[in-house]
Every structure is written in C-alpha cells, then in structure tokens.
C-alpha cells in the first residue's frame, strides 16, 4: 500500500533553538488518496460509531498503522473522519447492539410503607431520648431514694444487732449473778460449824 506523506519537510536546523523536533507520533499525516484507501481498508468490519466506537477505533488504528508503516494516534484518525462525516449524527443514529427499553421507575408500595413505619419508630425513639434528656434528675432522685432506703435498712439492722447483743449481755450477766449466788451459798454452808453435817463429823 502507499506510504504516508509527512508534512514539514524542512531541515531540523531551520527551526528555532527553543523548538524541539516532534516525535513520529505527533507528526501530521498528509491524507493522500493512497493513505485514505489504507484507512478504509482498516475500517472494514469496524464502525467507529455507537457505544463501542472507542474499541473499534483501537482496531482501526492498529491496522492503519500497520498498513502505512508508522504509528498514528487515534485523535488524528478521529479528526480526519470528522472532516468527511458528521460523526455525532452517526453516533446518535446508531442502533444499540443490545436491548435497552426505557420505562418510568415506580417505587413499590411495600418499600414506601416500610420507610414510613421506620420513620414513625425513629420519631418515637427520638421522643423518648428527648424525655430522658429533659428529665435527668428523675433518675438521680430514684437513685438517691433507693440509696436512702438502703441506708435506713442498714441502720435498722445495726440497731437490731445492738439490741440482740445487749439482750445477750444482760442474760449472761443474770446467769453469772445466779451462779455466783449459788456458789456463795455452797461455800457458806460448808464453812458454817453449826451445820448438822459438821456436828455429825465431830461426833464420829
């Protein structure tokens, strides 16, 4: 096939010192009839329109670059095709290769009802939280009242213990007194010489 003609055949020395020589990919392509024929051969079986136009353009670019013997960017091919065809109109008129029916979306009533119920529950929870935030002292009063009742119960139990211990001490003191009286009687009986038991002992 024909070779692509490259514009700007001047020598590199003719350019200014601040300008660099363009890379082969950035060089402009002179679209001669032979080069256009190479492009049409590369486009066989590939239409650069529709939703898959960029994938088709990759195949066209690879085949076209192989035919002319140099790499050509896709933008150069797009620009040249747009000079020959109305690419936007072709793209819009292209039929989709897959079914794509359009219909209005309607949210099911079940989901709407669930959302409404969820909102009601959330509102009730928020009201309860607001009540708890507004009345923080009520819980503290309950705690203080419960602690006060516990303190009273502990005081009563301690008083009962003291009573029991005092009663036990009184009983023990009474028992000790009784025992001391009995022992005193026994001792006096044994030490008295006028007792009959002592007289009997003397007689014997």
From Swiss-Prot:
There is a cross-link at residue 127 (Glycyl lysine isopeptide (Lys-Gly) (interchain with G-Cter in SUMO2)). Residues 1-15 have a biased composition (Gly residues). One of its GO terms (biological process) is regulation of double-strand break repair. The keyword Nucleus applies. It holds the Pfam family Eaf7. Residues 128-140, 153-175 have a biased composition (Basic and acidic residues). The keyword Chaperone does not apply. Keywords: Acetylation, Activator, Chromatin regulator, Growth regulation, Isopeptide bond, Nucleus, Phosphoprotein, Transcription, Transcription regulation, Ubl conjugation. The modification N-acetylglycine is found at residue 2. It comes from the Eukaryota. Component of the NuA4 histone acetyltransferase (HAT) complex which is involved in transcriptional activation of select genes principally by acetylation of nucleosomal histones H4 and H2A. This modification may both alter nucleosome - DNA interactions and promote interaction of the modified histones with other proteins which positively regulate transcription. This is MRG/MORF4L-binding protein. It comes from Mus musculus (Mouse). The lineage of its organism: Eukaryota, Metazoa, Chordata, Craniata, Vertebrata. The gene is Mrgbp.
